[in-house]
């Protein structure tokens, strides 16, 4: 097997399948490193009325997850939800809970009964 066979061609394989399920009149896809000041400023400028839902599927490191909460919590709308998937250890929930802004409900979701180690999700309800 050639190494290139292990990579997806986003434009020709993934996007056409996504197009079948996504209403692009109501959805926007932005691909970038979310953990830079430029990305946060872009999000702030683009989502002038705030963010209702944010899903972090980043590098899967504890530091990046904490950064996500610290960087994007100020942009979240009241009633909004910020989810971080693929939390790598149940032990991380304590630190992820500790960075929840005041008044924000934190929920640790453990779906590891499915047999997959990475089915841990941190949810912040604003």
Where are these regions (language model features)?
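Short, small-residue-biased leader/transition segments that mark boundaries at the very start
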Residues: 1-3
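The conserved SAM/SAH-binding core of class I Rossmann-like methyltransferase domains
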Residues: 8
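Conserved SAM/SAH-binding beta-strand->alpha-helix loop
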Residues: 11
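Short, conserved SAM-binding/catalytic segment
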Residues: 14-27
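Alpha-helix C-terminal capping segments
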Residues: 20-23, 47, 96-100
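Active-site segment flanking the S-adenosylmethionine/decSAM binding pocket
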Residues: 27-91
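C-terminal substrate-binding/active-site "lid" region of AdoMet-derived donor-dependent transferases
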Residues: 62-126
